[in-house]
């Protein structure tokens, strides 16, 4: 299972959505939504960037989350995405100070 597939499944389950529900919400035809999402989660198909961006928006995550190699990086991306502009500025300043 690819990193993208793993993160997609985890994010969908956290959102308490079925594969079909998520697929329909991002504009996939209801007749094929479940099957297509299943293929993405199993790594049999790879969604293009446009679809990943739709998935990210629907799940409240940055698109980069799905491509993060490590779990720490993925968690940091999630947390950063949730911050307001001031929080992001402060976190970037702190990161610069640590580096």
Where are these regions (language model features)?
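Residue-level signal for the short linker/turn that defines the boundary of a DNA-recognition helix
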Residues: 3-6, 16-17, 32, 47-50
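Positions in alpha-helical segments
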Residues: 6, 35-38, 74-78
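Short basic helix-loop element that most often maps to the first helix and adjoining turn
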Residues: 6-26
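Recognition helix of helix-turn-helix/homeodomain-like DNA-binding domains
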Residues: 27-46, 68
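DNA major-groove recognition helix of helix-turn-helix/homeodomain DNA-binding modules
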Residues: 44, 48-65
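Interfacial/linker helices and their anchor residues that mediate assembly or domain coupling
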Residues: 69-99
């Amino acid at each position: 299972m690819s990193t993208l597939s793993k993160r997609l499944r985890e994010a969908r389950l956290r959102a308490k959505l079925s594969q079909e529900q998520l697929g329909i919400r991002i504009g996939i035809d209801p007749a094929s939504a479940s099957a297509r999402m299943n293929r993405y989660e199993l790594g049999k198909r790879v969604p293009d960037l446009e679809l990943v961006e739709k998935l990210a928006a629907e799940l409240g995550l940055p698109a980069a989350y799905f491509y993060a190699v490590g779990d720490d990086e993925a968690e940091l991306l999630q947390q950063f995405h949730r911050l307001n502009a001031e929080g992001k500025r402060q976190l970037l300043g702190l990161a610069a100070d640590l580096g």
